[in-house]
């Protein structure tokens, strides 16, 4: 019998709900969590109670647990090849990269790895921008203005690790500022159907 719980993106509830599933509902396995924050909040519960979590989304790596199956792509399987593609002639031969993400583990770790990769491939530090916003951020006017300046002269791409409901206002403001894909291509890793 399947048990469904919804912590409603309230990070404090994730561990409590995981404990309920494992100890009260006696589930054999949990499929869930969507962010690194939620995964990291339940990890001690799964390890203490020898539970099994299937984590279904891309993740930043740098973590290994006997109690978690990481089924999503790690940075070297998704984000790094995507950026390498953007640097190639087939991908647009981009020379400038603006790393924009939500302020939590996955974007910060992913962008740390991407920044190191870009520098190792000869991209000057001045051609790498980096910025983070809180969860549920809605006002991208200033950030899109910075991207517009950064992209002046061409050859720029935005690497987006924005999460959740912040995507829609980002794309709207990107368009409101007259930016187009030819001005700054966007490579995004966490976009939903909204």
Residue ranges and their predicted role:
Residues 1, 33-34, 96-101:
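Short beta-strand segments enriched in small/hydrophobic residues
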Residues 2, 53, 97, 128, ...:
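Hydrophobic/aromatic residues located in beta-strands of well-ordered beta-sheets
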Residues 2-62, 71, 132-141, 164:
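Beta-alpha junction/loop-to-helix N-cap segments that form part of ligand/metal-binding clefts
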Residues 7, 102, 189-191:
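Cofactor-binding loop segments of dinucleotide-utilizing enzymes, especially the Rossmann-like FAD-
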Residues 38-40, 79, 167-168, 193-194:
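Short, well-ordered alpha-helical microsegments
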Residues 49-52, 123, 180-184:
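A short helix->loop->beta-strand "cap" motif at the edges of active sites that frequently abuts
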Residues 60, 67-178:
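Extracellular/periplasmic Venus flytrap/periplasmic-binding protein
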Residues 174-194:
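Extracellular/periplasmic periplasmic-binding protein-like sensory domains
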């Amino acid at each position: 019998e399947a048990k469904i719980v919804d912590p409603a993106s309230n990070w404090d509830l994730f561990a409590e709900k995981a404990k309920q599933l494992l100890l009260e509902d006696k589930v054999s396995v949990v499929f869930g969590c969507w962010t690194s924050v939620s995964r990291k909040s339940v990890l001690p519960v799964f390890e203490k109670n020898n539970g099994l979590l299937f984590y279904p989304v891309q993740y930043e790596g740098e973590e290994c647990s006997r109690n978690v199956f990481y089924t999503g792509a790690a940075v070297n399987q998704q984000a790094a090849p995507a950026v390498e593609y953007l640097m190639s002639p087939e991908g647009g031969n981009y020379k400038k990269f603006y790393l924009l993400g939500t302020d939590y583990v996955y974007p910060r770790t992913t962008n740390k790895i991407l920044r190191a990769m870009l520098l190792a491939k000869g991209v000057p530090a001045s051609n790498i921008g980096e910025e983070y916003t809180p969860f549920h951020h809605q006002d991208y006017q200033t950030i899109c203005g910075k991207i517009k300046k950064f992209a002046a002269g061409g050859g720029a791409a935005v690497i987006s690790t924005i999460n959740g409901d912040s995507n829609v206002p980002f794309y709207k403001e990107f368009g409101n500022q007259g930016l187009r894909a030819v001005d700054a291509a966007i490579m995004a890793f966490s976009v939903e159907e909204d």
